[in-house]
Amino acid sequence: MQQQHHYQQLIDLFDSCFAEEFNTRLIKGDDEPIYLPADDETPYHRIVFAHGFFASALHEISHWCVAGKARREQVDFGYWYCPDGRDAMTQSQFEDVEVKPQAFEWLFCVAAGFPFNVSCDNLEGDVEPDRIAFQRRVHARVMTLLEQGIPERPARFIRALQHYYQTPLLTAKHFPWPEDLH
């Protein structure tokens, strides 16, 4: 089993899975993550992840896997993003949007043998997010995906991760309940 996790591995795996068919490449960025569709200067779509962080790459890939074709033609998939410092209602909306991508991210992490941590992303907000409640929602989504089937793009990437990192097929036992994650 591969023990080292380096962002270049993810770039190579992602590009081998999706560069040709989806004209999309994974790019190490020097700043905040962003998705950029092809334009006059760059003939391919770019998933730019933050600072060479392995976890950031997996998270941004998960958002790409959620986005449909029309969303993949827009900067940052056309999503609204409210930065850190959200109030309770805005935090709730943020978490609603994040459940599905973070479920994919958890699947990717397990397939890569890499630790997963949910991200509520509100360190400076006036509300303390309930990480356990949010992780329960992400966990429930993971269980649904395992039972009903993982869509093609994330499933393809999971297979590539499993092959490279020599990890087993994903089952429910790989995703313990939040109380078990101490």
Please annotate each region the language model reported.
Residues 3-6, 40-56:
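Short pre-active-site segment immediately N-terminal to the catalytic Zn-binding motif
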Residues 55-68:
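Active-site recognition of the HExxH zinc-binding catalytic motif
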